[in-house]
Amino acid sequence: MGGFFGTVAKVSCTADLFYGTDYNSHLGTKRGGMATYDAESKQFLRSIHNLESSYFRTKFEEGLSKFKGCSGIGIISDTDPQPIIINSHLGRFAIVTVAKIANIEELEQELLAQNMHFAELSSGKTNQTELIALLIIQGKDFVDGIENVYRRIKGSCSMLLLTEDGIIAARDKWGRT
């Protein structure tokens, strides 16, 4: 289980992102993460914390001042450490997912055969958010890449992408996650 939150504002989005992500705390107990994009410095800022021994608020409140920007995404996840930040031919982006992918091992082997690599291992397993990001960057643009994800995965996936231009939200046709 898990839940995510995204926001775009004309002023700093940090407080909205913090409280919006915290609102999803009942959906997961393992990890929480937030990422913002600061257009002024052209930087993505990210933080991920383990929530198994403490609450989201406790883990993130002290470090809120480091987040800058008018757009951001956050997640409460029972699976992978997220968000992850990718630099690709599509541009830089942060991604969070809530997913249950039945054919993850098959897709992992296909991507490895294409000379792709996985850097975000989680408990010795492939981070499904990174796998989804690698499927996205196979597209000619974000829309084509997201369509590639939904053509290839067996299961369910909802996602938020934080790009330099804003937020892209997508879910599978069944909307199960």
Locate each region found by the language model.
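Conserved short alpha-helical segments that host acidic/polar catalytic motifs at enzyme active sites
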Residues: 1-177
